[in-house]
Amino acid sequence: MAMMSTVELTKENFDEVVQGEDNKEFVLIDFWAAWCGPCRQFAPVFERTSDKHPDITFAKVDTEAQQELAAAFDIRSIPTLAIIREGVLVFAQPGALPEATLEDLIAQARKLDMAEVHAGVAAQKATQD
């Protein structure tokens, strides 16, 4: 039996999963719903990819059950893939991605200079205050 490598994300466990012990987490989130055909097609791709990246948390949000979470991410169409690194949303895009595209996206997200990303977020916050 294969180990379930994806986590069901809810508003109850969201902070714990996304921030982790030290807020250094790398999380991919698949926003989906049972009635959504493309979501069902993307699910095995998401699962297979999760097996190849044990250091990344692959999480799924059932947008029907978790409407508040879906609203918080401003999800307008599904599936939508979001990537959070160190507590920062670094990518969000609707559409069922082919496996190669998903792998490429993960590689790009791994290469991000998070110090730079955090500096950018801080600068953005400063202009809003």
What annotation goes with each model-predicted range?
Residues M1-T57, E64-D129:
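Proteins that catalyze or organize thiol-disulfide redox chemistry
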